[in-house]
Amino acid sequence: MSVKSGKLQIIMVTSSNPHAGKTFVTTNLAMTLALADKKVVIVDLDLRRRTLSKQMGQRDNRNGVSGYISGTIANLNDIVFQSGLHENLDIIFAGLQPPNPAEMLLSEKFDEFMADLRKRYDYVVIDSVPAMAVADALITDRLADLTIYVIREGLLDRRQLPDIEKLYREKKFHNMSIVLNGSTGGARRGYGYGYGYGYGYGYGYGYGYGEDESQKSSAVIDSRYNLTQRLKDFLGLNDKK
């Protein structure tokens, strides 16, 4: 991920398809930076599916991005959670699914939110939506310094490669860098062909992304939930017996 620009403080992670591993890459990158003695925050900006928040058991946590941007939550400190993995690593969950995610990401309040995080942290690592699902990733990227585009071996159809190349060539994303996830290191016959196309494109370009999971409930966080334990499970850091 070699780039020529200055400090790459806000890092957005996206992909072509769901299940490419962008949330896994986001979390591991943030942890690596925290271990390097940098103050880091992970922000779940997939406001439609809230994948990272779901992985952490916080999908219905009202104290998240959507609540803060909408004005329901006034204090930024109320949506910042300590990860429990490292003192340098915080997490901001997505909050409840808003009716207008793209509009929320285009708001002045969102710009102020990101500016505040830039002041507070050395690095802001954003878990965004798949770039070919909805416009949210392109909207968010206007505030990013670096874009990590995750491709998963065996998932991406080769017919999608020209679209990814076009994103790179036309500089749709700031300092776009590619991460190949799940690589076995060897050649694979018929790589991805005939699998990703129907999933990525039929899924895609905004139609229905996250709509089937829309919830406006006032769910209360399970008091038994342990954020640190879930993060360790997700990162594979638990002690083996």
Segments (PLM) and residue ranges:
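P-loop NTP-binding module
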Residues: 1-241
